[in-house]
Curated annotation (Swiss-Prot):
<dbReference type="InterPro" id="IPR003200">
    <property type="entry name" value="Nict_dMeBzImd_PRibTrfase"/>
</dbReference>
<dbReference type="GO" id="GO:0009236">
    <property type="term" value="P:cobalamin biosynthetic process"/>
</dbReference>
<comment type="pathway">
    <text>Nucleoside biosynthesis; alpha-ribazole biosynthesis; alpha-ribazole from 5,6-dimethylbenzimidazole: step 1/2.</text>
</comment>
<dbReference type="GO" id="GO:0008939">
    <property type="term" value="F:nicotinate-nucleotide-dimethylbenzimidazole phosphoribosyltransferase activity"/>
</dbReference>
<keyword id="KW-0169">Cobalamin biosynthesis</keyword>
<comment type="function">
    <text>Catalyzes the synthesis of alpha-ribazole-5'-phosphate from nicotinate mononucleotide (NAMN) and 5,6-dimethylbenzimidazole (DMB).</text>
</comment>
<dbReference type="InterPro" id="IPR017846">
    <property type="entry name" value="Nict_dMeBzImd_PRibTrfase_bact"/>
</dbReference>
<dbReference type="InterPro" id="IPR036087">
    <property type="entry name" value="Nict_dMeBzImd_PRibTrfase_sf"/>
</dbReference>
<feature type="active site" description="Proton acceptor">
    <location>
        <position position="311"/>
    </location>
</feature>
<dbReference type="InterPro" id="IPR023195">
    <property type="entry name" value="Nict_dMeBzImd_PRibTrfase_N"/>
</dbReference>
<keyword id="KW-0328">Glycosyltransferase</keyword>
<keyword id="KW-0808">Transferase</keyword>
<dbReference type="Pfam" id="PF02277">
    <property type="entry name" value="DBI_PRT"/>
</dbReference>
<comment type="similarity">
    <text>Belongs to the CobT family.</text>
</comment>
<protein>
    <recommendedName>
        <fullName>Nicotinate-nucleotide--dimethylbenzimidazole phosphoribosyltransferase</fullName>
        <ecNumber>2.4.2.21</ecNumber>
    </recommendedName>
</protein>
Amino acid sequence: MFNISPANHEFDDEIQSKIDNKTKPLGALGELENLAKQLALVLGKDKPEIINPKLLVFAADHGIASSGVSIAPSEVTTQMVMNFVAGGAAINVFCRQVGLDMEVIDCGILQPLEGVEGVIDQRLGAGTGAIHKQAAMTLGAVKQGLEMARTRIELHHQQGCNLIALGEMGIGNTSSAAAIMATVMGMKGVDCVGRGTGIDAATLKRKQMLVEQALHIHEAELTDPYNILACLGGFEIVQMTGAMLAAAERNMLVIVDGFIATAAAMVAVQINANVRDYMIFGHQSDERGHCLMMEHLQARPLLRLGMRLGEGSGAVLALPLIRAAAGFYNEMASFSDAGIEI
């Protein structure tokens, strides 16, 4: 379904030599050096540049939210989407700070926002099924969502974009992400469920129970990534998965945000392992389990700020570091350029 080539490692040694011969001690720029190498492998060894980057925020509602797994009701998803459009959310502020264009995609919130300027309609339904009682969606909806995301990424690719950051909004989506994590990593649901929006101990216990219930009733169907998405996913998680795969297919980099985005990344890697070469992990969330996801994907997040907001916040805040990595690779003098003998 997605034809993704691995990053071209033909020039590994040449790229590493260019980094090592900059006017600095070996390895002195730490993770920025690894990041610069990844940029060069994906975007080209001569002068990798970040061009026309975009943030895509995918929004949808989850049936499990009606069973009280969050401090907020599902209506908050719609309210936050309107806040995004008005420019008043944290993610809007961060995008303005780093100079990043943002778009909001309705993948399936409960009430359609017909005629609301600034919201892109890619609806797969009015919220998913409650995963502890039924499948989140059909396999047909999964395939449709993946293709919708591909079409959106293709549009940005045609406009010259070579990097996308991904964010989400959806009350109840940490439950879905925890269930996906448990399935992909072979863990118990109770060990993957965190406090999400900041729930109390009683709500946490209920959330853990419902995720375990979801894993139990769907156990026989969780045989491949598409069925994992159909049984346990969210409309926004499906479209984030598709966006990652489609971006990699077009040789674009992807900044993965936090817990929910990383759940999508785990499924994307199951669909096509080569997508991993194109992923940059913006931050390590404070949500329980995210550090284990990082280990599973052999990822080194750029930031550890104790955040658990979602929206793409960690991905956007990592963008200046990515630009800095490209900048030193392209502009920093080598020892020979500077006439320095060591």
